[in-house]
């Protein structure tokens, strides 16, 4: 996964998130730049960062292994989404109406990291359903780089 020695202490990173959502013929793109923490545990890489929006702050944790990913969000938005290229995964979204079932069908999942420095990319493409109804196609990329 990386040439870095496994460490449980975290490193400050700058996170650049890009998301493109396609629903039918319509597409929307969003970008976020945030500062967060990077750490490794076992065979997984973790990114922790906050998203500040009108609704409030959402704390996000992204966990990536060679073949799977998990995105956990808490705070203003509470969501759990799992990704695996070999099978659909169930997750959840908590709303005022209760907890809704999310299903992801991963089309592409990759993680690359420059072994000489703490800088990398996580790319994810997936179809999202909520309560078994299609929501849209998502393409997400996260670039992270150690803060000097």
Which residues are covered by each model-predicted region?
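N-terminal intrinsically disordered, cationic/polar leader segments
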Residues: 2-82, 86-123, 127, 133-135, ...
């Amino acid at each position: 996964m990386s040439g870095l020695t496994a460490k449980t202490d975290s490193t400050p990173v700058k996170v650049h998130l890009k998301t493109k959502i396609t629903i039918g013929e319509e597409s929307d793109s969003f970008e976020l730049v945030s500062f967060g923490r990077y750490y490794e545990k076992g065979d997984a890489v973790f990114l922790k960062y906050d998203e500040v929006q009108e609704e409030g702050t959402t704390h996000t944790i992204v966990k990536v292994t060679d073949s799977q990913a998990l995105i956990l969000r808490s705070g203003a938005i509470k969501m759990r989404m799992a990704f695996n290229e070999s099978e659909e995964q169930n997750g959840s979204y908590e709303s005022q109406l209760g907890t809704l079932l999310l299903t992801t069908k991963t089309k592409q999942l990759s993680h690359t990291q420059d072994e000489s420095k703490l800088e990398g990319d996580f790319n994810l493409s997936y179809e999202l359903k909520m309560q078994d109804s299609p929501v849209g196609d998502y393409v997400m990329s996260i670039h992270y780089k150690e803060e000097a």
